[in-house]
């Protein structure tokens, strides 16, 4: 029962259009019922499932829906060695070309600060990746890394070889990428809008998610989430904290020191609390 809801998201952590995992009958039901109910449908898919044949079948049932692709990085080296994604940027480009051929909306997911990357490198890379996919994506969703228990990144975090991103890095990323999304300095809905940039820090403000010193986190997270709706840089006006200088110094040092994993230290709490953090 989707009464009162305009949008239906079907995320399978893989692909709704994967016939070996998802019965074709269920795929057809999702596509047809959302179309008949007039609901905006967003499905997740890997690149290899987005063939012309599959998309022709899907659009014959539901001619208007959005496909979300977890690209993570527009960089083959990062895709292979940092996130073990299993496809290349060429695969992504080919999938997007097919989606555009059938007039299907594209939502691209990018990862901010994947493992084995410093904060400064992550900041430089993400802006390049946004620029690379902006023209071909209706929406770009940047997901800052957060620590999930039992994963490799959890082990690195416990060994102090990885720290989740600073919230200030996300703010800086938005400022640097804004002109890519809005070449004339506009906001969401303006004629100059190339794509829509969405940033939603999972566990934002917590030690296992993107965080600052603890004093300013709530305010900064709220501003980031407001920007995703408005696309207006004024959301960040007047937001400041003493920890911003620490962030600046860390970024500066990482740009001039041979520290491939970065130098970021815990921003708050003692070692025991960091290890016990949820």
Where are these regions (language model features)?
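Core AdoMet radical
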Residues: 1-22, 33-50, 64-92, 139-143
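Auxiliary Fe-S-binding modules of radical SAM enzymes
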Residues: 146-278
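Surface-exposed cleft-lining segments at the edges of enzyme active sites
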Residues: 42, 77-85, 111-121, 156-161
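Conserved C-terminal portion of the radical SAM core fold
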Residues: 90-151, 171-201
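Acidic (Asp/Glu)-rich catalytic clusters
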Residues: 2-3, 31-35, 56-64, 97-101, ...
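Distinct, well-ordered alpha-helical segments
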Residues: 20-28, 51-59, 119-120
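Active-site glycine- and acidic-residue-rich loops that bind
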Residues: 48-51, 84-86, 115-128, 163-168
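Short catalytic/ligand-binding loop motif for oxyanion handling, primarily in non-cytosolic enzymes
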Residues: 17-19, 76-79, 115-117, 149-151, ...
